[in-house]
Amino acid sequence: MARKKKELPLLEKITITDVAAEGKALAKVNDLVVFVPYVVPGDVVDLQVKRKKNHYAEAVAVKFHEYSPVRAVPFCQHYGICGGCKWQCLPYTEQIKYKQKQVTDNLIRIGKIELPEILPIMGSEKTEFYRNKLEFTFSNKRWLTEEEVKEDVKYDQMNAVGFHIPGAFDKVLAIEKCWLQDDISNQIRNAIRDYAYEHNYSFFNLRSQEGMLRNLMIRTSSTGELMVLLQCKIVEESEMDLMKQLLAFVAERFPQITSLLYVVNNKCNDTINDLEVMVFKGNDHIFEEMEGLRFKIGAKSFYQTNSGQAYNLYKVARNFAGLTGKELVYDLYTGTGTIANFVSRQAKKVIGIEYVPEAIEDAKVNSAINGIDNTLFYAGDMKDILTQEFINQHGRPDVIITDPPRAGMHDDVINTILFAEPQRIVYVSCNPATQARDLSLLDAKYKVMAVQPVDMFPHTHHVENVVLLEKRG
């Protein structure tokens, strides 16, 4: 006999008191901490518990009794469905206040180290249309909104291009307007969608692995250049013809596109790192500019997605490094060498290390394009490349700049940094929690001298943080 499912409680007239991880807010009911999406501190709501553990629960708001005085009206029609921009219900001034608190709480609670006064967070000048890259997914499993489901109508058009629905990997929400990228992105996506509808193109099915149209990537830059990459599954010659007809339509409709590319992808996933990118029209790259430096960006290249704030972030890192032109700098997790090249004019020599070989090739190209001859780049796993032997061979760094992934630095990397004993360490992080853990491991030899949070992603809970450490006397 099947076990009867336990009925979860309805919590009435609960006041939301704070923000929490992953863009959620929280309330406390007796000793129970309740995490709730799409509410803000000050809201008074009825909460339907969806999942309950001993000391915490997850719930959704089913009724609002009072709206918080700081609540903002979300500006996007897709808010609350697509899974992005979860903090649109908070004014931007409140968002950055909570991001500042997130950095402070993590450094104190996890790091448990002596801290200077944390500098005020550096907010983003642009809070809409700030991204330079978006990817959209094609699917024949369009997500139906609650209103559409209630109408109990059989819809003829179930193809969609947009964003994956959280928790429903094969469903895609049809996006009409996204506020993250310049509006040309919306125009291109919608034009491709309409053309595909009109000409009966097949959209990909993630479960059956059938269908032609798979993915669309659009990149913009401050130089005005524009890249569009269409990813398709091609099993018949006729489908290749259909794809090229679509690309020809895009080229004619949007002559401002400077790089029109395509990828044939017959794999089970959408990653293109191991696939050949073909040029349909224009160049295979676009450029981004920063302080007179030009950075070449291909379809596979990594570049910070908020160009304006990336510049501010890099300036903070460079200022913290305190370069005089005499220093040997190690740039760890260098990516395409953006920071390495950005600080090279103020350093004697910069050595960049990165896991992805293609990114290192981009870094070398970017040095060459800008006439920079004092950089060296190495590809490989950081813990395997950055060793005591490597340091003995290349020299002890005066400054280390490190910008690791969200997981932070491997223990072996931290131990090698401690062996290298640079005078200063500049730690750039996209995850203050793992940064705090790493800082505690460096604390015996290094003191935190400055902390600068930077908001790269308005309307999300994500925050970057830059920390300067100096060797203890």
Predicted regions and their residues:
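Short, acidic/hydrophobic/Gly-rich beta-strand patch recurrent on exposed beta strands
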Residues: 25-30, 162-165, 229-231, 363
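Short, solvent-exposed loop/turn elements at beta->coil junctions and helix N-caps
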Residues: 119-126, 206, 213-215, 453-456
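Terminal RNA-binding accessory module
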Residues: 1-78, 376, 383-384
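Rossmann-like S-adenosyl-L-methionine
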Residues: 2-13, 18-23, 237-473
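Extended interfacial segments that mediate partner engagement and assembly in macromolecular machines
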Residues: 63-74, 80-202
